[in-house]
Amino acid sequence: MSKPNQLQTVLSVAACKGTRGLLRVTGRGGTALPGKAARVFAKDILEVTSSGMEIIVVTGTNGKTTTSRMLEHALTAAGHECLANKSGANLLSGVTAEITCNATWTGKPKTHYAVIECDEGALKQVVPLIHPKVIVVTNLFRDQLDRYGEVMHTVEQVRMGIQKAPEATLCLNADDSLVASLALDVPNKVVWYGLDTPVGEQKDADISDAKYCIRCGTPYQYHYHTYAHLGGFYCPSCGYHREKTQVAVTAIPKISADGSLVSMRMELPAFGSCPEKSRTCEVRIGLPAVYNIYNAAAAVCAYTAFGLPADEILLSLADVRSSFGRMETFRVGENRVQMILVKNPAGCNQALAYVASLEEDFNLVFCLNDRTADGHDISWIWDADYEQVIARKQGSDEEHAIKVM
């Protein structure tokens, strides 16, 4: 890997900015193609245009976009200039386009901080170029079967990416045995986050993505579950178990359509010198559902591991707003519409659990696509638990009105 010279840099940046400008004039988004154009003149232009930036990378199956949004919102609200790939273009070309288009003509970055959402498969290409300070892994599930195959392939893709960033601090979900396994045999500093409390009821079928110990193959047992294969896992044979968390949700007094109220414990010395050994506080999260509680914990973990004050992100979580399709709410005529994006069984089940918990009546519409960005293989839909919505009840015996369209 060799850095481009000054002429290559100028031509590369010009190609990137020019292509994006042309695409936008013609009414197109211009998210990935400008990056491809930039790399024609300088294959590793991203290493130049990101040089000197402090970067958080967020990867994982579910929650990348929302966790990134929480981090970017906190940085901006605190007065820090921050770059983020809000468009969701999270492959190498998309990341190259976002960072390079926001550089000067000579390739100097215009902002000091960046929050980059990165596809699991692209992590090994992106991180050697941008040298992130922090890498967050949200969770790992079966996803886009035609692209990734089974979940262990995804685990290995992320592992290869982490191995190319030995200086990065890892913020890992302690409740996910697959994510936790990424800490094995790497030199990186690791900070753990998770939920120290169970959530709802658990069905055996929900843990199909990680039933067996990644070390010895014995079926995991659980002290408690949160959802899918996440929770207080341990192996009764070899002793492999959930790690102690430095950022943990210890109680969830309220989950509603307007968001959640949680108690969060932070072991602050994990993030630098601080007179407090630990701190527990009440945190309001402006997005609903259990998985957004996980996203908030991940964001707090990353923000503080980044070296920034915890209060900045704790305050900002109350008014964070959803990204496109992620619990996005809007009006169509007199109707309130909420859009929930799902792309795999685990995400779908959590969305359905949220819908089933709503007290008001509603119409439910399922829309399915099989385009390249979301995967051509849609067989995953047969593994989701739609019955929990149909069977939902209010109180002890009164069924809600629901219309599935």
Residue ranges and their predicted role:
Residues S323, L341-M405:
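Active-site beta-alpha connecting loops in nucleotide-dependent enzymes
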Residues C118-D143, L182-T280:
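Extended acidic/charged loop-beta regions that coordinate divalent cations
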Residues L129-N139, L230-K244, L287-A318:
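A conserved, hydrophobic alpha-helical segment in the catalytic core
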Residues K3-G194, G200-Y212:
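Phosphate-binding loop of NTP-binding sites
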